[in-house]
Structure formats: C-alpha cells, structure tokens
Amino acid sequence: MGEALNVMESVRSIVFKESENLEGSATKIEGYDFNKGVNYAELFKSMASTGFQAANLGDAIQIVNQMLDWRLSHEQPMEDCSEEERDVAYRESVTCKIFLGFTSNLVSSGVRDTIRYLVQHRMVDVVVTTAGGIEEDLIKCLAPTYKGDFSLPGAVLRSKGLNRIGNLLVPNDNYCKFENWIIPIFDQMYEEQIKEKVLWTPSKVIARLAKEINDETSYLYWAYKNRIPVFCPGLTDGSLGDMLYFHSFKKGDPDNPDLNPGLIIDIVGDIRAMNSEAVHAGSRKTGMIILGGGLPKHHVCNANMMRNGADFAVYINTAQEFDGSDSGARPDEAVSWGKIRGGAKTVKVHCDATIAFPILVAETFAAKRKELSHIRCQV
C-alpha cells in the first residue's frame, strides 16, 4: 500500500510539475472580442496576443515601429564624433536607414501599390528587387494584369497567349507593348554610351526607364523622383533580359559580340553603390524589411554585413529553412554571418506577403505618415 502511494506521488510530481510564474513577464494569449464591434485598429493590435503567425506579425509591426521611431538622439554620443554629431537638433533629425527588398511576384500583385506608397512618401531609403520587380512595374503602366486561378491549365493558357503568375494572368500582348516602348529607349542609351561615354549600371538603367515611363502609378517613377536608389543585380533575368538580348543583335555585332556587344551594363558599379549604402550609413541604425526570398533577400543582408550587420530585420515569406536555402533561412542564420547584429530586433513572419504586408504598412508607415513626412524628407 505504502509503495503504491509512493509511486503515485512520484507520478503526480511528474504530471503536475510546478511551473515558472509567467505573470508580468509574458504576453497573455487572447484574441479580439467582436462583441465590442468592428474596430480594425484594435483587431490588428490584438494579433500580437493571438499567437502563431498573427503574433509574429504583431512582433513585425512592433519592430518596424521601432525602426521608424529611432533617432540618433536616443544614443549616447561617441567620444570621437564630430561637433555636428553632438548637436541635439542634428541627432534628433537622424533616422534609421531602411532597406526594402521584395520579389517580382509582389509587383505583379496588388502589393505594388503598397510599395509605391512607401516610395512615393520617402518612407524607405534603398530598394532591392529582381528583374521582374522592375519590368512588371513598367508593364503595368502600359497594360493591366488580371485575376485568374491557380488551377487554370497551362496548355490552354498558352494557346490563348496568357501567362500565369499564380492566380494572376498577364496577356502576352503586354510584353509586346513593353518591347515597343523600351527598345527605342535602349537605342537612345546606346547612343549615349557611344557618343557621351555613359557607363550604364543596372540602377542607372532603372532610373532612366523610370524617368521615361513618367507615370505616378509606378513605384519606380517615385523612386526616380525622390532619388531613392533601386538595385537589381539580376537585371537580365526576365523580360528585360529578353529585350537586352534582342537589342544586342540590333546594335551590336551579331556575329562577333566581342567586337561590339551593343549596350553594356556594369554590375560592379552597382555592387559598390549598394554596399556603400550600408557602409556609409555611419552612425545611423539600419533596418531591413524583406518580402520573399532569393536574390533581394541575400543582396540586402549581404550589404548590411559590410557594416557588421543590420539593427532591425523583418522577413515575410513562406520558405522553409530545412533545405539550406537562403530564402528559407531565419534571421538567426544571418546573425551567424554578421549580416544582422547579435542584439538586433528581428522576426520572420511565415505568411504570404500579400496578406501580411498591407496590414504591416497600415499599422506602421501609414499610421505614422504625418510625423514621418517632415523628418524623413530631411534625410
């Protein structure tokens, strides 16, 4: 009898193990109460205490707001800083430098308009994307993209001249219009290369195309107007590459491109410019907001390695880390490379960016637009 009681007491001590007290040190999980009516601000605020990816999105909102709220005046002046850097007004004017990276599919989607809003109001400082993130923005100024379905048969769509991007449809005519628009611009750029010795980099090409499109629905137009650099090291990986390929036969030597390759684009100039954006951030903190993975994610992170890592990082993507891909890697992996600082504020939101990013912007950049409009225009 006594032995049985001892066994039961041992079992009870295992099952009913005493807990650490989390009261006051951890967020209590509770969702939004719709009995209080529909209040979107409170609904979004409640995500932080909902759990799972809603909580991660809540953390992302908090971190981006920390990026936007940071001023150099929050830090103690260094012993070797200049007189200007000691000036109180100057220190209050210095904000976090924000790098925004995103993949092309997001420009194909309606997230393009969210990106345009940020660039239009100078809420980000550096943009990195893929070739599709450039061309899709320009093409949408010429012709629209339409909603389709993920399950539409590829062979049927091909017979109709319709290209599918997930559940979006892009008529092939859009690319024909793009060719008609861009080739004369490439002709002009080639003439400037020959006669004026202009050395084109991807970012210079992008700025020129943005100037020529002259359309306020384009985020590239606003980047050009606001002098926000847009980097794309993979500029040839898309329709832009197709156009450059065709143009090289038109202006270059079709039989011996070594003698005359046509329009030349220098990628080394841009890697210097991109890395310099991080290196010369100086006393500013840097923040990374990266939508999707691949080239933009790595390019932004790698540039920040040049300054011993970013101070804030928000990733939004659905990629998994277990195949070793950079796309799926969590922020902590970037810490091991020196791309994010050890004490940085970071989060990865495992979610489709078309869902998460507009909510994030609503609760951060858009909510703070009035207070940001003055100070970020001075940066």
From Swiss-Prot:
Gene Ontology biological process terms from the UniProt entry: spermidine metabolic process
This protein's GO CC annotations: cytoplasm
Quaternary structure (record): Homotetramer.
Record: active site: 339 (nucleophile)
Keyword terms, alphabetized: Hypusine biosynthesis, NAD, Transferase
Species per Swiss-Prot/TrEMBL record: Nicotiana tabacum
Source taxon at top rank: Eukaryota
Necessary cofactors: NAD(+)
UniProt binding sites for NAD(+): 104-108, 130-132, 136, 237, 293, 318-319, 352-353
Catalytic activity reported: [eIF5A protein]-L-lysine + spermidine = [eIF5A protein]-deoxyhypusine + propane-1,3-diamine
Protein family according to the UniProt entry: Belongs to the deoxyhypusine synthase family.
Pathway(s) the chain acts in: Protein modification; eIF5A hypusination
InterPro entries: Deoxyhypusine_synthase, Deoxyhypusine_synthase_sf, DHS-like_NAD/FAD-binding_dom
A GO molecular-function annotation: deoxyhypusine synthase activity
Heme is among the record's keywords: no
Entries under Pfam families matching the protein: DS
Entry protein name: Deoxyhypusine synthase
Residue sites binding spermidine per the record: 135-136, 242, 298, 324-326, 333-339
EC number: 2.5.1.46
Class of enzymatic activity (EC top level): transferase
Signal peptide: none
Functional description taken from the UniProt entry: Catalyzes the NAD-dependent oxidative cleavage of spermidine and the subsequent transfer of the butylamine moiety of spermidine to the epsilon-amino group of a specific lysine residue of the eIF-5A precursor protein to form the intermediate deoxyhypusine residue. Also able to produce homospermidine from putrescine.
